[in-house]
Amino acid sequence: MSKGFTFEKNLPHQKAGVDAVMNVFVSATSHQEDNVSIRLLVNPELRLTEQQYYKNIKKVQELNGIEHVKNNYDARSNVIDVSMETGTGKTYTYTKTIFDLNKSFGINKFIIIVPTLSIKAGTVNFLKSDALKEHFRDDYEREIKTYVVESQKNAGKSTKSYMPQAIHDFVEASNFNKKYIHVLVINTGMIHSKNLNSTYDVGLLDNHFDSPFSALGAVKPFIIIDEPHKFPTGKKTWENIEKFNAQYIIRYGATFSEGYKNLVYRLTAVDAFNEDLVKGIDAYIEDIVGDGDANLKFIKSDGEEVTFELNENNKKTLFKLTKGESLSKTHSAIHDLTLDALGKNTVVLSNGIELKIGCSINPYSYDQTLADSMMRKAIKEHFKLEKEFLTQRPRIKPLTLFFIDDIEGYRDGNNIAGSLKAKFEEYVLAEANELLKIEKDEFYSNYLEKTVKDISSVHGGYFSKDNSDKDDKIEKEINEILHDKELLLSLDNPRRFIFSKWTLREGWDNPNVFQICKLRSSGSTTSKLQEVGRGLRLPVNEYMCRVKDRNFTLKYYVDFTEKDFVDSLVKEVNESSFKERVPSKFTQELKEQIRAQYPELSSRALMNELFNDEIIDDNDNFKDSDAYSRLKSKYPAAFPIGVKPGKIKKATDGKRRTKMRVGKFSELKELWELINQKAVIEYKINSENEFLSIFKSFMLEETERFTKSGVHTRIDKIYIHNDMAMSKSIVSDDDDFAKLNTMSYREFLDNLSQTIFVKHDTLHKVFCDIKDTINITEYLNIQTIRKIKSGFSKYLLNNSFNKFSLGYNLISGSIHPTKFTNADGKPLDEVLSSDLGVLQDNSKAPLDTYLFEEVFYDSELERRNITDREIQSVVVFSKIPKNSIKIPVAGGYTYSPDFAYVVKTAEGDYLNFIIETKNVDSKDSLRLEEKKKIEHAQALFNQISQSVKVEFKTQFANDDIYQLIKSALP
């Protein structure tokens, strides 16, 4: 099990967010502090004229498709905005930005401001993690040193008052040691605290600054704000933030409730869902059939007594309650709900819901049967997920999050029959015992045994009152939930159910939350996106690597009072995206966008159509204000609107499935079973010497890949210029690079041998042979091993069939179940439509010979194959589901083709075709890796053809499937 998350470098959507901020500072100059005594303690000043600042922002906005309007920029503001949807990696993005600002301009002191303690805990854990240090160390040779502002305990009888320790250490930290970037993390509560708003006897920076605000302002910090909607301008918190005297404030969030200052990047919710950067969402809505149409309204209060009006079955009844009374007095369905506080216009219920006069609740949403049903359903679905994910390789550990208001029933319910905890454990035990009876997977069976043996170990909770609790067991739970994601995700740890009372609603998340169950309504106006945000991130596997090769879904359970949850969420997702900018001219970019989806249109034909339909004029300008709209209507596939269908849906909508034309499967059966045989790739390398030669060639061709481990001397010189002391760094030409290896040669060979499965002797001989070109003893580090592994895998792929040949061994054995068949080999009635394609065409029926009743596809070329031009000789054809057939290729990669065809010739013979679609003009447009993978597929099907004839063909954008098949017929 990995000890930390594996971060991915240069994910396009995160890199774009980093680049957007960095490009704001193009042409900026860095100026050192004039005061020599504190120069190494403060940031250099980044200078940029207002004109250049405006020019940079405008250019960045144009690059990122952001409308350059007054609401999106203010050249007089030092606030820069980066909008990224929940779950897409805001924290990573701003952390990488910190490293880049340090690398480019020497900015060394940053303040990260977060709204809540839970966000602060998550941020600090992220910044301090060993995995993050390792991830950035290769590229930046720096690491972040984190300072956390906590509430300060009474200093006792000391006669002098001292600045809070974290602030003292941060302000006084010297930039002389270039190893560190200094980051102070502070939450809203601390900004308002007495600790920050006091003056102290012992000041900072040579005792010039005796208050935290003045001392922090003196270091000229860059400020990062997380969740900007929690920091409205004009309010007290923002006034205090301005006291930090930041050079620039960079705000990162999904919600900007007051609008933007200088918006430079936006990754919308639509982008996140459509590009599969987050999970899709299924909402499980618990409906009450029959009764349930009741309304309990707060109608008045005198500050001592509250009046509620119950309206049920057209009958109205008044109830008077005082503080502490139970609302069960008003309706029999209500349990565990009391009146906690009351004023003349507002009351607060024990579950945290605040009601103003005129507001109401539905009593049935507090019915115990409803809550029990939701909990049972969530537990049952959890175990279904768990069985699927923990019996595959690599394994994924799913988590389920329950939001509750019955804290006593959970925390104190151990020995109380019928308590929330007792019922939960009863339901979990029942499911686990049932699964144990039939489970054959050894690992999962043992995992279930642990569950049954110690049921209390499978769940944990975090509630705000826990912060003052001294119970060791509770403290352990909180540490796992709040601070140690890796421990929570460990397969050695049976805890996978988490309970909270909305304390975790914002600022906390875990990538492996696959279910969120709201056993009580939150009573909050928080956006639906914020609510589901706890589980939107893509999951990680047992090795802490993000899994992105398939579609995942977050299951969200709500009661009938939120029956419009999905509609509201979809509306919010689409409304949160940009209003589209309407261009005035038909550009080359638009032309390419249309032709990518309609490749049958030549450039000339497209332009002629647009001119004839009076969409554009002779100069390619749109003819009128409606022309762009007509263009989108004419070519809809090129202009997708909003979030894709099915990304957010009710669970009752079912998983998207499409019906198979089962009668046709018998005609495809032989080919389907043939291509589902397992195959093992065989490298036809005749001797160890031949392999040695290949590995040696790789090392000689890829010498620039490797980075030496070592130390060199940098000389910082202080000199006088115009009566002012200055410094500059010099690297001497005579500097001897001091080798500093992180492992011995033997350790390096052992590690490399195990990583790339090559004998020690072979590696040693190669390194001896090439020592005059590259002396491997200067590169003995883990980065070299990683680069050899990734580089050699790609080298094997790119040089297959050239420097060595290969073949395939087919493994006999049962191939069922498959994506099309059950364990007995019988065809399924329906399959997941997402396995066939993410796009759907409802306007056309599939061809009669197609295996399925609906049209799902991934490209326009695929759609044409499925819907256009029936081919008389084709008996049956089908899309090959994603990841159902994985052809092994050199270097450890795999390859999956797109279509299977069975054709009957005029002579009555049957021919089989496997088609790979490539939406490019020709083979010349393919990357080398794609060409090589196609060669591998060709080799496999050539071998299969020795027993049953199978033709493998590649279809390019301009290829008609009819002509492609016809050309191969005898």
UniProtKB/Swiss-Prot annotation:
Residues annotated as signal peptide: none
EC number: 3.1.21.5
Domain of life of the source: Viruses
Residue ranges of the region described as Helicase-like domain: 75-540
Effect of P897A: Wild-type DNA restriction
Stretch list, region Endonuclease domain: 894-918
Cofactor(s) this protein requires: Mg(2+); S-adenosyl-L-methionine
InterPro entries tied to this protein: Helicase/UvrB_N (IPR006935), P-loop_NTPase (IPR027417), RE_endonuc_C (IPR045572)
Any one biological process term the GO annotation gives: DNA restriction-modification system
UniProt keyword terms in alphabetical order: ATP-binding, DNA-binding, Endonuclease, Helicase, Hydrolase, Nuclease, Nucleotide-binding, Restriction system, S-adenosyl-L-methionine
A Pfam family it matches: RE_endonuc
Enzyme class: hydrolase
Domain remark from Swiss-Prot or TrEMBL: Has a helicase-type domain in its N-terminus and an endonuclease-type domain in its C-terminus; ATP and DNA hydrolysis activities are mediated by the N- and C-terminal domains respectively. The C-terminus is probably required for interaction with the Mod subunit; deletion of residues 897-970 is unstable as is this protein when expressed alone.
The family this protein is said to belong to: Belongs to the type III restriction-modification system Res protein family.
Any further remark recorded for this protein: This R-M system is also known as EcoP1 and EcoP1I.
Function, in words: A type III restriction enzyme that recognizes 2 inversely oriented double-stranded sequences 5'-AGACC-3' and cleaves DNA 25-27 base pairs downstream of one site, producing a single-strand 5' protrusion of two nucleotides. DNA restriction requires both the Res and Mod subunits. DNA topology affects its action; relaxed and negatively supercoiled DNA are digested but positively supercoiled DNA is not a good substrate.
Protein's name in the database: Type III restriction-modification enzyme EcoPI Res subunit
Lineage, top ranks: Viruses, Duplodnaviria, Heunggongvirae, Uroviricota, Caudoviricetes
